[in-house]
Amino acid sequence: EYSYIHEPVRKVDDWNHYPEAMDVRNFYGGDLQGVWDKLDYLQDLGVEVIYFNPLFVSPSNHKYDIQDYDYIDPHFGVIREDAGDVLAEGDLDNRHATRYQSRVTNWENLEASNEFFAQLVAEIHRRGMKVILDGVFNHCGSFNKWMDREQIYEGKDGYQPGAYVSADSPYHTFFDFRGAGPEQWPYNGNYDGWWGHDTLPKLDYEHSEALEKYILHIARKWVSEPYSVDGWRLDVAADLGHSNEYNHEFWKKFRKTVKEANPDALILAE
C-alpha cells in the first residue's frame, strides 16, 4: 500500500513466522470492529478498563509516530472512500501511494472513523467499562500533516503546507530546524528528532504557543463528548519539552485542561 522506513509495508499471513528485528512495517490485522465483536468476551473476563495503544492516523504498526491527532486511523475505523493505487513493486515513493493517501486524508473516511469510535466508547461505557487512550505528545511522526516529509498532504484541499515542504508553513515553529535559513527549503529534512530518529520529529513547544494550544485542544477533545474517553496514558512524558521547568509547567496545564473537561479522567504518565 505504501512504504515505511525505506521498505514496503505488508500484511503478515503466517503468524508462526518469527517477528523481524525491525517489525514496525508488518501488520497483523485487527480493527475497532474486532474490539466491538469481542466485548462480550472481555466483559465475561471481568475486564473493567480497555487501554488502547495509539489509535490516531499513523503509518507504523505501533503508531507512536502520529500522523494526525484529530482522527482515528481509518485502517482501524471506517474506510468509505478507497480510491487510488498501491505502490508498484520496487517503488518506495509515497507520493505515488495514492490509495494510502485517500484512506488517511479523505474527510469522509476520517469523520466516519471518529464517529465509529464514539459509538464504540458509548457501548463500552454501557457495559460498565472504561477507555484509556495513549497520548504521544513529545514527538509526532515524519508523516504528520504538520511536517509532511512524505508529501502526502502537499497540495490537497483542506491542508496547509507541512514544515518539511515550505519555510512558510504555519507549522514551522512546531519543530526545531536547527537555525536553518529559508534557502534550505523546500524539503528540508534537517530537524531535531527524538533520540535522533528522523521518523519521530520532536515537538518544539518552547518556541510555539500555537503548538501548545493545539495539543491542549487535543487533550480536551478526546475526553469530551462525543468521545468521552476516561483518561490518557502519556508516552515518554518526562521527555516533553527541552527543560524540566517547561515540562512541569506543560503537564500542569495539561492536567488542568483535561480535568476541566472531564473531572473523573485518569492521567497516567509513563
Each language-model region and where it sits:
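Substrate-binding/active-site clefts of carbohydrate-active enzymes
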Residues: 1-48, 55-226, 254, 260, ...
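Conserved beta-strand positions in the central sheet of alpha/beta enzyme cores
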Residues: 51, 132, 233-235
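Short His-Asn-centered micro-motif
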Residues: 53, 269-270
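Surface-exposed extracellular loop regions of Gram-negative outer-membrane beta-barrel proteins
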Residues: 224-241
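Acidic/polar loop patches that form or flank catalytic/metal-binding clefts of enzymes
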Residues: 230, 264-269
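Short glycine/threonine-rich loop-to-helix capping motif typified by GTGT followed
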Residues: 241-249
